């Protein structure tokens, strides 16, 4: 079985497959992805593969510079997005936005 290149919490799977979630915000450990990369996507909880994505953009962001656009791309409110990011990456300030599309 081929390993996944990136994982998402299972709760995001349906939004990704439906095209409602088109970005992911990660810490420095996942800042190496670049435009044009084709990635196998799995669930964080069980590593189960569920789709393939293409990276279509990358940028940097902080909690303070997150916008309503980022929130829409994550299919959340801005308040929800800030809460989720702070919960996943406590004590971090610099993040990496990966824009993607399902293939």
Swiss-Prot record:
It comes from the Bacteria. It catalyses: N(4)-acetylcytidine + H2O = cytidine + acetate + H(+); N(4)-acetyl-2'-deoxycytidine + H2O = 2'-deoxycytidine + acetate + H(+); N(4)-acetylcytosine + H2O = cytosine + acetate + H(+). It is an enzyme of class 3 (hydrolase). Residues 6-94 form the ASCH domain. The active site is at residues 21, 24, 74. GO terms for molecular function: hydrolase activity, acting on carbon-nitrogen (but not peptide) bonds, in linear amidines; N4-acetylcytidine amidohydrolase activity. One of its GO terms (cellular component) is cytosol. Keywords: Hydrolase. It holds the Pfam family ASCH. Gene3D superfamilies: Hypothetical protein. CDD domains: ASCH_yqfb_like (cd06552). The keyword Aminoacyl-tRNA synthetase does not apply. Its EC number is 3.5.1.135. The keyword Hydrolase applies. InterPro entries: AC4CH (IPR008314), ASCH_domain (IPR007374), PUA-like_sf (IPR015947). Coiled coil: none annotated. Belongs to the N(4)-acetylcytidine amidohydrolase family. Catalyzes the hydrolysis of N(4)-acetylcytidine (ac4C). This is N(4)-acetylcytidine amidohydrolase.
């Amino acid at each position: 079985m081929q390993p996944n290149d990136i994982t998402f919490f299972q709760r995001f799977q349906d939004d990704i497959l439906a095209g409602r979630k088109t970005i992911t915000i990660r810490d420095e450990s996942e800042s190496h992805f670049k435009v044009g990369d084709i990635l196998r996507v799995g669930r964080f909880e069980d590593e189960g593969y569920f789709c393939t994505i293409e990276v279509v953009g990358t940028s940097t962001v902080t909690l303070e510079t997150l916008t309503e656009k980022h929130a829409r791309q994550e299919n959340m409110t801005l308040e929800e997005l800030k809460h989720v990011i702070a919960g996943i990456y406590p004590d971090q300030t610099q993040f990496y936005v990966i824009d993607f599309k399902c293939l």
